[in-house]
């Protein structure tokens, strides 16, 4: 009985120590865009190696879903593949959530097909609009309906869900209005589901961020984009996103930081500062397949966080806005 009692005592002591250790570990919560997820996840992994006392969790609720949590005060950081909308700004303001808008990288939103697709190596914005506009639902169901030169084959569509910032940006850039899209496509907030869908269907077409294409380029084919029939076909790439040649699907991606959390909880500020460290902001962003910010822009956004400047630089169109433009824009809260 004595041995059992001692063993029990040691077990209780060990459990208590574990609980105390867990309680001592500070927590930073991030959620939102699946496109931004690889960047924030890479940052979190490296950060936690050097900061064992801080745990960073990163969810994938989609940009819209992430902002819902953020504006309810449930998260410290919201990953976003498009800027905060007017309705989201209002929700945050009504809840007393002040936010700091920080672009973290550039992305080339990538249209993809199955590798065996020999006819749609390049497409115009008009081609894509014809496929994705609301009027196409139930009507444009065959590749030949897009262009006469395309084969008589069914077309299967894959795309992010309606809570996704990538969905918002694509519909704005291609159709001309956010959320303006046909609804008869396979939708998922998990880009890996889209990868598997297109990779397994010779007639498929889909879209998502460049990083997921780069990670799966051996089983997918990227479509070159033309602004019109006379324009050159431009492939989605780090270089073409950096130079602005890849239009209209180049875009900045963001994190939004809860100002109060950054002010009152050192672990949040420490993680954001790590995120913006020039070495990490270049090497880790490149590592996951996105385009690092220009040096001058990164410095400007470091200063924005240091000064805790709140609000958004987006009050007009979100399509075609450069990072350099964002540095100059007046913030509105």
Task: Name each model feature, range by range.
Residues 24-333:
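Flexible loop/hinge segments at secondary-structure junctions
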Residues 10-11, 22:
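Cleavable N-terminal signal peptides
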Residues 1-8:
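Bacterial N-terminal signal peptides that target proteins for export
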Residues 17-24:
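Sec/Tat signal peptide C-region and signal peptidase I cleavage site
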């Amino acid at each position: 009985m004595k041995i059992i009692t001692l063993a029990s005592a040691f077990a209780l002591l060990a459990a208590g120590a574990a609980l105390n250790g867990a309680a001592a570990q500070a927590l930073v919560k991030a959620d939102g865009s699946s496109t931004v997820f690889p960047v924030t996840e890479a940052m979190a992994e490296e950060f936690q190696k050097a900061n064992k006392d801080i745990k960073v969790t990163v969810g994938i609720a989609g940009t819209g879903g992430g902002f819902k949590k953020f504006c309810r005060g449930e998260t410290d950081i919201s990953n976003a593949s498009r800027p905060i909308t007017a309705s989201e700004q209002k929700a945050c303001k009504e809840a007393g959530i002040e936010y700091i808008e920080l672009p973290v990288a550039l992305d080339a939103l990538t249209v993809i097909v199955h590798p065996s697709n020999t006819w749609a190596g390049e497409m115009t914005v008009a081609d894509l609009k014809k496929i994705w506009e609301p009027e196409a639902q139930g009507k444009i169901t065959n590749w030949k309906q897009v262009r006469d030169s395309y084969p008589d084959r069914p077309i299967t569509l894959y795309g992010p869900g309606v809570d996704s910032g990538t969905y918002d940006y694509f519909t704005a850039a291609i159709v001309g209005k956010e959320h303006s899209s046909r609804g008869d496509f396979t939708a998922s907030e998990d880009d890996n589901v889209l990868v598997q869908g297109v990779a397994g269907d010779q007639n498929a077409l889909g879209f998502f961020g460049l990083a997921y294409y780069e990670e799966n380029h051996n089983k997918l084919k990227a479509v070159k984009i033309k602004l019109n029939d006379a324009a050159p076909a431009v492939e989605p790439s780090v270089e073409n996103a950096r130079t602005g040649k890849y239009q209209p699907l180049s875009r900045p991606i963001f994190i939004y930081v809860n100002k109060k959390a950054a002010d009152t909880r050192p672990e949040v500020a420490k993680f954001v500062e790590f995120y913006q460290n020039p070495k990490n902001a270049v090497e880790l962003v490149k590592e996951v397949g996105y385009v690092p910010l220009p040096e001058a822009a990164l410095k400007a956004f470091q200063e924005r966080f240091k000064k805790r400047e709140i609000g958004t630089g987006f009050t007009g169109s979100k399509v075609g806005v450069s990072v350099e433009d964002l540095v100059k824009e007046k913030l509105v809260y």
